[in-house]
C-alpha cells in the first residue's frame, strides 16, 4: 500500500459519521444517488462552522447527506437545496426530519439548477455547494460566485474525478471540465482557490472580488 493510500484509508476509517447521516447515506445509495464521502462531509462541516454560515445553497441534494453535514457545521444556517429529482428531494426531507432538523432550516426546490440559479439573489449566501450535473460544473460555479457575498465560499466535491483529472491522457468531457475549472480558478483574481485531496477531492473557492 502506498503512502497516499495508507493516508486515505486512515482518514476514511477515522471519521465517525453521525447515525442520521449514515442512514441518509444508505437510503441515497438505495435510490442510486451518489452522496459525498464522509471525509468530504466532515470537511464541509468544518468549513461551514469556520465561516459562521447563515445562508447556504446546495446544488444536488445527495438525498440529504451533504445538507446534513453542512448543517452539522452551521446549525444556525438556512439551507436551500436544489435538485431535479423529486425522489432525491423527498429522501432529503425525510433525512432532515429523522435528524430533527427544524423545518424552518431547509427549503427544497425541485427543478434544473440552470433554470433556478439565475433567479436567485446575488451576494446573498455564505456557501454554495456544487454537486450535480458535472458536465455543467463551470456554469454552476460561475452562478455560485455570483450568489455568494464577498468572502463567501463555493465548494465543489469530486473535483479529482477518481484520479482522472491528474491523468493528462483522460480527456472526456467531465474530466476536462474539472481540470479546466481547477486551472482557471488558480489563475483568477476574483477568488482564492485550493484543492483538498480528502475523499474524492474538494475544490474550495473564496470570493475576493477582482483585484
Residue ranges: model-predicted function:
Residues 1-127, 134-155, 159-211:
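A short alpha-helical cap/connector motif
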Amino acid at each position: 500500500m502506498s503512502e497516499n493510500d495508507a493516508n486515505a484509508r486512515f482518514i476514511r476509517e477515522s471519521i465517525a459519521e453521525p447515525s442520521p447521516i449514515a442512514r441518509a447515506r444508505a437510503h441515497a445509495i438505495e435510490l442510486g444517488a451518489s452522496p459525498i464521502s464522509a471525509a468530504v462531509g466532515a470537511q464541509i462541516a468544518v468549513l461551514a462552522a469556520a465561516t459562521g454560515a447563515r445562508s447556504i445553497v446546495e446544488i444536488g441534494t445527495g438525498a440529504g447527506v451533504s445538507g446534513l453535514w453542512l448543517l452539522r457545521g452551521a446549525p444556525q444556517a438556512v439551507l436551500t437545496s436544489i435538485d431535479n429529482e423529486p425522489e432525491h428531494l423527498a429522501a432529503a426531507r425525510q433525512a432532515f426530519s429523522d435528524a430533527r432538523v427544524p423545518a424552518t432550516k431547509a427549503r427544497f426546490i425541485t427543478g434544473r439548477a440552470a433554470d433556478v440559479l439565475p433567479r436567485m439573489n446575488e451576494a446573498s449566501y455564505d456557501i454554495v455547494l456544487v454537486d450535480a450535473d458535472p458536465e455543467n460544473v463551470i456554469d454552476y460555479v460561475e452562478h455560485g460566485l455570483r450568489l455568494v457575498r464577498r468572502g463567501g465560499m463555493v465548494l465543489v466535491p469530486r473535483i479529482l474525478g477518481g484520479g482522472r483529472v491528474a491523468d493528462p491522457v483522460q480527456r472526456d468531457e467531465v474530466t476536462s471540465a474539472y481540470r479546466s475549472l481547477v486551472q482557471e480558478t488558480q489563475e483568477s483574481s476574483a477568488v482564492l482557490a485550493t484543492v483538498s485531496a480528502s475523499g474524492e477531492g474538494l475544490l474550495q473557492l473564496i470570493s475576493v472580488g477582482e483585484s
